[in-house]
Amino acid sequence: MGSHATPTAAYWSFFENFNRKDADGWAGAMSYPHVRVSAVQPPRRGDGPGPRTASGVYPTASDYAAMAERAGWERFELTGWVRTQGITPRVVHASSDKVHLAGGWTRHRADDSEIVTNRVLYVLSRMEEGWGIQARFGIDGYNKGADRSAQKAAALGALERLMTTLEPGDVDNWLTCFHYPLTLVGAPGEVSVIDDAEAMRAAYGDWAGEALPISYRANDIAAGENGVTLSQSITRGEDTFHQSFLVAQQEGEWKILAVSAIA
């Protein structure tokens, strides 16, 4: 789909159609294939990938709308939910056909009290039809006002380790910097899920094995109990580009779970 005039129009359409309980309209806010990656690993419900699976890819709008119809809104309504309010998004990185937006939402009851709040990194891409959300990197453990300095430091440390293994071309140790399955979001329409380290080696081992000087700047975007989103501007050799990461703590280890790059 991805038929919106601007990235922010697609972002707001996401919430408007969710609140209307319009499965087709909600699916129309996305670009495809679409992926939702969560820092939290919930139990699988047995009905295929859902918005909160660790890494669920939806090939088409029909696939996403079918998931939404199947899952329904009853589970939200049972908590007292009547609407979800998106926060004003902030542009993190942008090119002519891809944008990283720092956004999020709060679910409200009828009396306007808050049920839960989240922070999400939205990856928007411009397809032939227009803009849509290609990927969502969810913190899924966000608490307003909580001190997350330790989580931010751990996530930045995980990124630093990634860089210190990449610079000398140390592929074996570089491969250990990721949680698998690893989600990669490239050019518009390019979403891949790498199942394990050997698949990552086959796909990117030659690229990572080239020793090149690296300089970069990185900042945290949002942090939760077990997940942090980061932004990075990097120069590697002659190439300069921007990246956003979802870094997650799983089994006590902070590693990269998802990456989106903008050249």
Residues of each region from the PLM?
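Extended, well-structured beta-strand/loop surface patches
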Residues: 97, 110, 145-158, 226, ...
